[in-house]
Amino acid sequence: MHELSIAMSIVDMAQEEAERRKVHIDAVHLELGALSGVVKEALLFSYKVACDGTPLEGSRLVVKDVPIEVYCSVCKVPRRLASMQWFCCPDCGTQTPEVIHGKELVITALELKQ
């Protein structure tokens, strides 16, 4: 389960930033792409485990799901895919290997305790 090592890295990065700014963190906001290879539920569970005994204990991991978006070279516009099974434009059917969004695994914000 690589989600635990990812969660530990998230906690480490957030903790370093909290120490640098001398603040306490209430939540870590994350964008998680459908193609990231990370299971959201496993990451949420692992985050709680990784936070135990750290200054982030009790904080929340807020995950924003990022759908798969590809660029269609025929339609000349980005298209959102319903699933990752077929990388084809949903309008014209052209194969679309150019992924614009969906691979994300990015900390986007740290929510500070009041």
Label for each model-derived stretch:
Residues C72-C75, C89-C92:
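Short cysteine-rich clusters marking metal-coordination/redox-active sites
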Residues V70, F87, L105:
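Cys/His-enriched microdomains
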Residues A82-Q85, V99-K103:
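Short Cys/His-rich "knuckle" micro-motifs
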Residues E31-L35, K64-I68, L110:
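Short loop/turn motifs enriched for small/polar and acidic residues
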Residues M1-S59:
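Long, charged N-terminal interaction/targeting segments
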Residues Q114:
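N-terminal loops that bind phosphate or other acidic moieties
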Residues V62-V66, V70, L81-A82:
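Immediate flanking context of iron-sulfur cluster ligation sites
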Residues P78-R79, T96:
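Cys/His-rich microdomains that often coordinate metals
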